[in-house]
Amino acid sequence: FFKSKGNVDSDVVLSVCGESGRTVEWLVDCYGVQLQLVKGFLYPGHTVLRMHAPPSRTGAELIASLVTACERAGIDILTNAQVTKLFSTAGGMIRGVEISRPNNSRELIGCEALILACNGYGGSPKMVEEFIPEIANAIFAGHDGNQGDAVLWGRKLGAEIRDMGAYQ
């Protein structure tokens, strides 16, 4: 609430806060992800210690352990592939994707469920202009692949999008 000066959906904030501790415990207990409370550093905007990280405090270790947890749970993760098309039922259920690989090969992959995820849209000047016009001319230091694809897909499927103006 403090960092956003109260400009948030309080129900969403309370839900995230209420479930985050149980989520950390679930990752540790059910999937063996090694996480510990980060002590000695109060993250910006935080009033108490609450950040958890792997022992090395590196993103590489965290991602590796999360990938291992997904593999144990039978969840497929595709990398080095860009989704070029979604296939859905008349009711809007996604049942497959078309992907392209760096060598320009294409694959069709069926699915029972699909998580639309992207690491932001900072690499898309058009989306930055639309959602955060005050930083439209800012230098973007992230990955060029951050084009907001999941946001675009969600819109096409009729999903509601909100709170798109936040940035660090």
Model-derived segments and their meaning:
Residues 102-105, 109-168:
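Glycine-rich loop(s) and the adjacent beta-strand/alpha-helix scaffold that form part
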Residues 54-112, 148-157:
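Helical element adjacent to the flavin cofactor pocket in flavoenzyme catalytic cores
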Residues 40-42, 90, 101, 118:
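Residues that line or immediately flank small-molecule/substrate-binding pockets and catalytic motifs
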Residues 1-76, 80-82, 126-129:
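Conserved N-terminal/central alpha/beta ligand/cofactor-binding core
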Residues 39, 47, 55, 90, ...:
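Solvent-exposed, flexible loop/coil residues
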